[in-house]
Amino acid sequence: MDKLQKLLNIVDDSVEEIVELEQELVRIPSINTGVMPTGNESEVCDFISDMLNKEGIKSKLLHRDPGRDNLIVDYPNVISTECKLLLMSHTDVVPVENESKWKYDPFGGEISSGRIYGRGSNDCKSLLTSQLMSMILMNREGVKLDKGLRLISGADEEHGGRWGFGWLLENYPELLKAEYAVNEGGGIPVEIGEKIYYLLGTGEKGRLEVEITIKGESAHASLPWLGVNSSYKLSQVLDLIKNYQPKLDTSLPFFQYMDYFGVEEKISTKNIDQIIKILEQKLPRVSHLSKALSRMTITPTIIEGGIKSNSVPEKIKLICDIRTLPFQDEKYVIEELDKLFDKIEEIDYEIDYMSVPNYSSFDTKLKDSISKAHAKSIGVDEIKLIPSTSNGFTDSRFTRENGTITYGFSGAHPDDDPILANVHGTDESIGISSLVSGTKTMLALAYDLCNSE
């Protein structure tokens, strides 16, 4: 039996410890509302730092503001401190919108039917657990690495990273410098017949928030004809957004692999919507992803307006989420909005560019190493990877900007149904099988890339 297999067997023997760590992390309510003071990431970081100290592993905490720490851990037993592999995650979680709808305590870390439930159990404390345990178990076994292995778990990922990886990039870019990095945003299995493929997160759509101000003229509600009700203009704006026909595009690498999903036709802008409809019946997740990756989306999310119930509203604000493809910059978005609303009078909008589109090349040593590591983790000869662009955004954009090849890959187990994860939703959860396979994958990846001897 080779050294790596012995280490993977130790992971199997450590399932109880892996599960307990995940539960402890979920029980810390590191909720990020996006409005300061918020986050509470420091409580998570302090817990982990104390745990690592007992293992003889030092950690560093850095923050822009108190309570919002970022965790930095360097694997201690290395020959060269030059960072080869960066393991990325985040400690903040989104709020629980309606706790009464939850079957399980959102911050209880309860176990049922082989799953751990709670806010952040999947996004992103499961990945953090797997990465931490891979480091801890290697260190206990005295594994020496030729090149550096670093873990960074950032604050504020759920609201743009301005207290997390974004702040670290501005102030400590050297910490984010590595040849390769692995983060959330991929590693989801897609079963097609008897074959299993995995989506590898090679890039991300851009994200903008647009605040649309719709202006009218106030009046008393008993004499509404004396005013101009901005609510009616809002209705027009919403109808325009609902019926918006974005430009179609099939140039992303993902569409070059559609034959894996049984699509025989060459994908083009002319047939993509027809193929999406066909895929919806047999592979709904692939269908949804194909739709997201072939167009820009504009989604109304927040409406604010009116000051009293007996007054005609003079002004209404509509906030929309916009997701863009790689070639669609801020100028493109403004041009699209101008065309969309050209017949609406008294309307203004401000754009906040949260994340630019970003990507890493698919053909790299990191891709090959992930494929090999995860195949070893789940006990198969090989796995097929498909390059995927995320319709969401993660902290990967900061490391890519810093010159690091970065992929999203969590190492989910093929038996763990991703639909049950319910990320950001009610009863969010992670399969214990994925916690274990993720830990094995992170360990095998570090062992391979950092040239363990």
Predicted regions and their residues:
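Short glycine/proline-enriched loop/turn "hinge" motifs that connect secondary-structure elements
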Residues: V15, K101, V143-K144, G201-R207, ...
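Histidine/acidic-residue-rich, glycine-tolerant segments that coordinate divalent metal ions
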Residues: V143-S230
